[in-house]
Regions:
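A short loop-to-beta-strand scaffold at the N-terminal edge of the catalytic core in hydrolase folds
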Residues: 66-82
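Primarily recognizes the serine-hydrolase "nucleophile elbow" in alpha/beta-hydrolase
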Residues: 142-215, 229-233
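Catalytic nucleophile-loop/oxyanion-hole region of alpha/beta-hydrolase
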Residues: 102-104, 109, 123-158
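Conserved alpha/beta-hydrolase "acid-adjacent" motif
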Residues: 256-263
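Short beta-strand/loop motif that positions the catalytic acidic residue
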Residues: 244, 249-252
C-alpha cells in the first residue's frame, strides 16, 4: 500500500526545489494593506493538487460546508521515509499562518528536511477560519488516529511526533495536552485508536491567553485564543500539562515573546515532563 504514496517523494522534492509554495513578501498583501489570503490559498491548493492525499474523514468531515470555497476538506500528505527498514519514526507537520492562511515553507520544506533525515512525514492541511481552533485541533487529532491505525500497513513504527509552527505549534501543544486513547466501541474504526502524540515540537507558538496578556500582540478577545475564560484556559497549553504529557521541544526566535516558551517550560518542569 505504500507504493501509491511514493510519488509524493518526488513531488515534494520538486515543490521544494521550485519554491512552489513561496510568495515574495511584496505579494503577501493587497494594495489596501490587507493580507492576500485568497492568493495564498490558491498557491497552496495548486502546489498540493498533484499529491496523493489522505482525507481525514472518508465519509465527509463533520461540520464541514462550502462557506469558504478555497478550503478543501482537511487532509494530510504522507511522504514515506527513504528507507522504511531504517525509519526513525513519523512526524506530523503542521504549518503556521495565524489560522487564516498556510505558510508553505513550514509544511513542505520542513517535511522534506525530515524525510531526508530518515523519517516518515505527513503534511497536515487543517481547517482555517471561519472554522474554529477546536476544528483545527480535531483535524490534528484525527490525523494522529489515522497514522496509528495505519501503523502496520504503512510500516510506521511505534512513535508519532507532532511538529508545528506558530498556529501549527499551538495545535501541536493542544494535542499534546488534550487527547484520548480511542473508543473501542466506535463504529468508526479510526476512532478506536488514540490521538496522543509521543512527542511535540513547538516552534514559536502563542501558548497562552491567561498566564500573561496579549501573546504576539493578539487581543485577548481573539476567538482563536478562546471565547470566555473556560475556553481560554482549555487552549492555554501550560494550564493543561500533567505527568502524562508527552515530552516537548520548545523553540522561538529572537523576535518572539520569550514568555511563551518559558511559561510552558515551567509547567513541564513542575510536572517532571522531559523538555528541551
Amino acid at each position: 500500500m505504500l507504493e501509491k504514496y511514493r510519488k509524493n517523494i518526488e513531488l515534494l522534492k520538486q515543490a521544494v526545489e521550485t519554491d512552489a509554495v513561496i510568495r515574495p513578501i511584496a505579494k503577501h498583501r493587497k494594495p489596501d494593506g490587507s493580507l492576500d489570503i485568497e492568493g495564498n490559498l490558491l498557491l497552496w491548493n495548486k502546489a498540493l493538487e498533484p499529491f496523493e492525499k489522505t482525507r481525514l474523514w472518508e465519509q465527509g468531515t463533520p461540520g464541514f460546508d462550502d462557506r469558504d470555497p478555497l478550503q478543501e476538506e482537511p487532509y494530510f500528505v504522507f511522504v514515506p521515509a527513504p528507507d522504511e527498514e531504517k525509519c526513525r519514526g513519523t512526524i506530523l507537520v503542521a504549518h503556521g499562518g495565524g489560522f487564516t492562511w498556510r505558510t508553505g515553507t513550514e509544511g513542505l520544506n520542513v517535511a522534506w528536511y525530515f524525510h531526508n533525515a530518515g523519517f516518515h512525514t505527513a503534511i497536515l492541511c487543517y481547517r482555517l477560519v471561519p472554522y474554529t481552533r477546536f476544528d483545527a485541533i480535531a483535524d490534528m487529532q484525527r490525523a494522529i488516529r489515522i497514522l496509528r491505525a495505519k501503523r502496520e500497513e504503512w510500516k510506521l513504527g511505534e512513535k508519532i511526533a507532532v511538529m508545528g509552527f506558530s498556529a501549527g505549534g499551538m495545535l501541536s501543544g493542544n494535542c499534546a495536552t488534550h487527547y484520548d486513547f480511542g473508543n473501542p466501541q466506535s463504529e468508526d474504526e479510526t476512532e478506536r485508536f488514540g490521538c496522543r502524540p509521543d512527542a511535540a515540537v513547538i516552534g514559536y507558538g502563542a501558548m497562552t491567553a491567561v498566564t500573561f496578556p496579549k501573546p504576539f500582540g493578539m487581543m485577548q478577545d481573539d476567538p482563536m485564543m478562546g471565547n470566555g475564560i473556560e475556553e481560554k484556559f482549555y487552549l492555554s497549553i501550560e494550564k493543561n500539562v500533567d505527568q502524562d504529557t508527552p515530552p516537548m521541544f520548545i523553540w522561538q526566535t529572537m523576535s518572539d515573546d520569550g514568555r511563551n516558551g518559558m511559561c510552558l517550560a515551567k509547567a513541564l518542569q513542575d510536572a517532571e515532563v522531559p523538555y528541551r
